[in-house]
């Protein structure tokens, strides 16, 4: 499969042959499994104090008192320790021994990655995610794109190939999160827009654009390509990144 390499002015520089993984079968089931496995590694174990709710001298009265057989405090008839009592232990508290990480076979993980890469050049899947773009995919820039140092230069290059409208879509989608999360460092929700994949680590000019993620081809994973387990993210590649993708 061949693809056009675009200049930063929007013209066509040349044609290149895409790696074989761009022709991989679309497997949404494996993509979902791989993303869940990746997300599970970020979970932290939670547990409660082992003696929470039972640090009390309460004992049951036994039979013959006309009251239920629950532990009661010494200075009265108030129940303690049991889950249904105020200040009592939790019935089924979280335990640190719980296995949080989901496993995935190595070959399944590799196939999910290749499938997510292939989905990034399918216009129907990209449109179904709500992305806005003009022209055809894949979107591949010449390596000069990685040398851009100003955000305005990046905006100009993205406008020239007809994808800046997707960043505007993400910018308009920003809203205050419902619930307690707004008090816990995640006040705003915003839709994902472009994914920019480069060959080098020092491309910082696009990091402040709304919804944009910039990642090197070596650090690229399934979650970058399929946020929310839905494949078909609008992706901008550089020529060197596509070439280095062959070795993944």
From Swiss-Prot:
Gene name of the encoded protein: rpl4
Entry GO CC: ribonucleoprotein complex; ribosome
SUPFAM superfamilies cross-referenced by the UniProt entry: Ribosomal protein L4
Subunit comment: Part of the 50S ribosomal subunit.
Organism: Methanoregula boonei (strain DSM 21154 / JCM 14090 / 6A8)
Keyword terms: Ribonucleoprotein, Ribosomal protein, RNA-binding, rRNA-binding
Functional description taken from the UniProt entry: One of the primary rRNA binding proteins, this protein initially binds near the 5'-end of the 23S rRNA. It is important during the early stages of 50S assembly. It makes multiple contacts with different domains of the 23S rRNA in the assembled 50S subunit and ribosome.
Origin: domain of life: Archaea
Family: Belongs to the universal ribosomal protein uL4 family.
Name listed for the protein in its UniProt record: Large ribosomal subunit protein uL4
GO BP terms, alphabetized: translation
Pfam family, any one: Ribosomal_L4
Record-linked InterPro entries: Ribosomal_uL4, Ribosomal_uL4_dom_sf, Ribosomal_uL4_euk/arch, Ribosomall_uL4-arc
HAMAP family membership: Ribosomal_uL4_A (MF_01328_A)
NCBIfam families for this protein: rpl4p_arch
Region (Disordered): 69-92
Gene Ontology MF: a single term: rRNA binding
